Amino acid sequence: MKYQLEISNITKSYGDLKANDDVSLSIKSSSIHALLGENGAGKSTLVKIIYGSLMPDTGLMKWAGEKYSPKSPFEARENGIAMVFQHFSLFESLTVEENIILGLDKVGLNENFTEEILKYSKQYGLDVNPQQVVGDLSVGE
């Protein structure tokens, strides 16, 4: 049987805490799945690994039979993988500008709009360096 996404023996730890411990699963193309579990079970961590915003400590992923190891959400998007957020969110590992570009790409606009968006951001009180990593911003920014 052919699978679109295969995950084998994924492990991700935060210090002594194992968020994912030897997780394996296979997903067929055009199928719908849900990750269910208690708070702290590692669901979000696994999704972030699939989406490329976190790297696993160990394990292997395959997309359409080929090794798959996205280094960013941009690479994941090239394979048609995107994330729909329950609550508004930014990718903490990306810069302000990269977050804007990712959003523009999603709605079919190009990077030329980035400068204009940053101009309006300043006008409305969001005056940040576009090259600053979002995870380094204060909560109010």
What are these regions (language model features)?
Residues 1-141:
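Glycine-rich phosphate-binding loops of nucleotide-dependent enzymes
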